[in-house]
């Protein structure tokens, strides 16, 4: 099949889907390519981002947590976006694309519930019906988000098959779409899956890095030494990285969830500790058994609990343009507490992984003058009960 855009990033990516879905992916690619050239579409998208979502988001200099070091640390405040996380950016773009293609329904999958909430709010705003697949386990651990989705008119469908988490929700959503794509658009929630999704999601998130670049130049008069973002599927990270890829002086650091520790096998770090395989319509590194079955990923943060990773991250890793590291649950929790206590910001547990790595860089080299930007991809309201239970069990509260 000929595509308008390259479906691969090096060897990663592709369109490994049943033949029945090829026309849907082709139609989506055509709609996206024409929308990118359509000033009216771009103006509508920009208007929603500004007047509905609240862009541009702030770039906040940390006042206190860098004390005693020579690090200057900024946070890109995607937590201030309507909906509470970076997810809102690209769902508005995809919902507009769905309308452009004449679709009336949205299908989505969600783990932490953030993408589900974003899909529900975009659907409510633009008059689309919305059904969201969510692992039954996640439905339990993210009840506030489930209620938010339902308040905005979405149907939330708990998935009990397999491990009853995000990977199973992804499978069910794709299965639904293969029978309903004439009227429904599949609103994929991260920069992964079959082409053209990784490219679409990157382009609909790239304003994160574009704004960051302009803001840091205005505030500091130079580009940062590194930008740091957490990586599950990798959409907030690719949104931050995209505009810096050609700026070779800027380090790109992606932070995977180390869970209980890489050595325990209970983590979500397939990029550095998985094997390349085919899953969810793409060729990418993933967590798999010796026999090639997809393995359970694990993270304290439901939004990073994904057994694979977007193909462009796999490519950036393979050519050495970006560095990928991992942070454990405990390190992320420590960073979460630090930001709350010393900056008055409650970050999402996902974003806390990126922050934890920045704090590590700072503490390992207190005398090093470095300018760092962390993508604070979401707010932590959804995580306060999880954190409360852990701290209570430890006797810290």
UniProtKB/Swiss-Prot annotation:
Transmembrane region(s): none
Cofactor(s) listed in the protein's UniProt record: pyridoxal 5'-phosphate
Pfam families according to UniProt: PALP (PF00291)
Class of enzymatic activity (EC top level): lyase
NCBIfam families, A to Z: trpB (TIGR00263)
Quaternary organization: Tetramer of two alpha and two beta chains.
PANTHER family named in the record: TRYPTOPHAN SYNTHASE, TRYPTOPHAN SYNTHASE-RELATED
Family: Belongs to the TrpB family.
Record's protein name: Tryptophan synthase beta chain
């Amino acid at each position: 099949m000929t595509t308008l855009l390259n479906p691969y990033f090096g060897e990663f990516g592709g369109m490994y889907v049943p033949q029945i879905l090829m026309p849907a992916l082709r139609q989506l690619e055509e709609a996206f390519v024409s929308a990118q050239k359509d000033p009216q579409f771009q103006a509508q998208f920009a208007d929603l981002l500004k007047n509905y979502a609240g862009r541009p988001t702030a770039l906040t200099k940390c006042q206190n947590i860098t004390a005693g070091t020579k690090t200057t640390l900024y946070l890109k405040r995607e937590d201030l976006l309507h909906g509470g996380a970076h997810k809102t950016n690209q769902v508005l773009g995809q919902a507009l694309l769905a309308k452009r293609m004449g679709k009336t329904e949205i299908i989505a999958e969600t783990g932490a519930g953030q993408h589900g909430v974003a899909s529900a709010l975009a659907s409510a705003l633009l008059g689309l019906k919305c059904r969201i697949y969510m692992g039954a386990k996640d439905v339990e651990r993210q009840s506030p988000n489930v209620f938010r989705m339902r308040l905005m008119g979405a149907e939330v469908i708990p998935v009990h098959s397999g491990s009853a988490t995000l990977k199973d929700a992804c499978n069910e959503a794709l299965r639904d779409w293969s029978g309903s794509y004439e009227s429904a658009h599949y609103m994929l929630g991260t920069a992964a899956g079959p082409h053209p999704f990784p490219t679409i999601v990157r382009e609909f998130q790239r304003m994160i890095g574009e704004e960051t670049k302009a803001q840091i130049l205005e505030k500091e008069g130079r580009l940062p030494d590194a930008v740091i973002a957490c990586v599950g599927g990798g959409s907030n990270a690719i949104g931050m990285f995209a505009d810096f890829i050609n700026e070779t002086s800027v380090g790109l650091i992606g932070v995977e969830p180390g869970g209980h520790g890489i050595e325990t096998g209970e983590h979500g770090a397939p990029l550095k500790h998985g094997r390349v395989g085919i899953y969810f319509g793409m060729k990418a590194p993933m967590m798999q058994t010796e026999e090639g079955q997809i393995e359970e990923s694990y993270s304290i943060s439901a939004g990073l609990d994904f057994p694979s990773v977007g193909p462009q991250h796999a490519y950036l890793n393979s050519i050495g343009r970006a560095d990928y590291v991992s942070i454990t649950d405990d390190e992320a929790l420590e960073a979460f507490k630090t930001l709350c206590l010393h900056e008055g910001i409650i970050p999402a547990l996902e974003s806390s992984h990126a922050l934890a790595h920045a704090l590590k860089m700072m503490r390992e080299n207190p005398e090093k003058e470095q300018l760092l930007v962390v993508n604070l991809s979401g707010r932590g309201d959804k995580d306060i009960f999880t954190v409360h239970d852990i701290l209570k069990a430890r006797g810290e509260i």
